[in-house]
């Protein structure tokens, strides 16, 4: 059973929506399916093609051996948890991690965001419900940790401002910003609410939206969404 590989890149290619590398490890060539994000970094020479380390999930089938490579053990273990769900195959698991980060998936589970899960190719309504239900039980501690963190960061006593924040999140989502991006800037927005409220008697939703979009645009200029 192969669980970890370190070697040099020999080749990389794409077949439909599958992304592969050929790694030379001590004279042996290993064909490994990888995530699209890592594939693009290799193709654009953004990372070295020497001494590549991949955490590998080895799946044995009757007619073949499949290797799936990840840049972290956390990704690999998350992939394994997804595969443990009835009816979910390796390509669904890869599809989820191609489209979303682990934290985004956990947030979707927490909020029961079936629409987001269904946006992964191959996942329908019933499978999204099963994924949310079963992954929720598998990642209880992570979900509780996120909830406690959110409560600590986003606790606001004023119900009117709370409503503004909720509306702000929904508006930003409708403008195609990702949940991860929104969650990253919300604590900053909330810290500035007191200052805005003291300086201006008419703190409005429009001012919060403008402020949020300014921070999001600053982030997107450094990190492509």
Swiss-Prot record:
Under what name is this protein listed? Answer: Holliday junction branch migration complex subunit RuvA
Domain III as annotated region, ranges = 161-225
Assembly, in brief, is: Homotetramer. Forms an RuvA(8)-RuvB(12)-Holliday junction (HJ) complex. HJ DNA is sandwiched between 2 RuvA tetramers; dsDNA enters through RuvA and exits via RuvB. An RuvB hexamer assembles on each DNA strand where it exits the tetramer. Each RuvB hexamer is contacted by two RuvA subunits (via domain III) on 2 adjacent RuvB subunits; this complex drives branch migration. In the full resolvosome a probable DNA-RuvA(4)-RuvB(12)-RuvC(2) complex forms which resolves the HJ.
Just give the chief location class.
cytoplasm
NCBIfam families, from UniProt? ruvA
Q: What InterPro entries does the record tag this protein with? A: DNA_helicase_Holl-junc_RuvA_I (IPR013849), NA-bd_OB-fold (IPR012340), RuvA (IPR000085), RuvA_2-like (IPR010994)
What sections of the sequence does the record tag as coiled-coil?
Answer: none
Ranges for the region named Domain I are 1-71
Query: Could you tell me the gene encoding this protein?
Result: ruvA
Could you name the domain of life of the organism this protein comes from?
A: Bacteria
One GO BP annotation of this record: DNA repair
Annotated region described as Flexible linker, given as residue ranges? 151-161
Signal sequence range: none
Compartments, record wording: Cytoplasm
State the similarity comment.
Belongs to the RuvA family.
Q: What is known of its domains?
A: Has three domains with a flexible linker between the domains II and III and assumes an 'L' shape. Domain III is highly mobile and contacts RuvB.
Q: Which GO terms describe its cellular component?
A: cytoplasm; Holliday junction resolvase complex
Where do the record's region annotations for Domain II lie?
A: 72-150
* Role of this protein: The RuvA-RuvB-RuvC complex processes Holliday junction (HJ) DNA during genetic recombination and DNA repair, while the RuvA-RuvB complex plays an important role in the rescue of blocked DNA replication forks via replication fork reversal (RFR). RuvA specifically binds to HJ cruciform DNA, conferring on it an open structure. The RuvB hexamer acts as an ATP-dependent pump, pulling dsDNA into and through the RuvAB complex. HJ branch migration allows RuvC to scan DNA until it finds its consensus sequence, where it cleaves and resolves the cruciform DNA.
Q: Which GO terms describe its molecular function?
A: ATP binding; four-way junction DNA binding; four-way junction helicase activity
Keywords associated with the record:
Cytoplasm, DNA damage, DNA recombination, DNA repair, DNA-binding
**Pfam families membership:** HHH_5, RuvA_N
Family matches, as HAMAP family: DNA_HJ_migration_RuvA
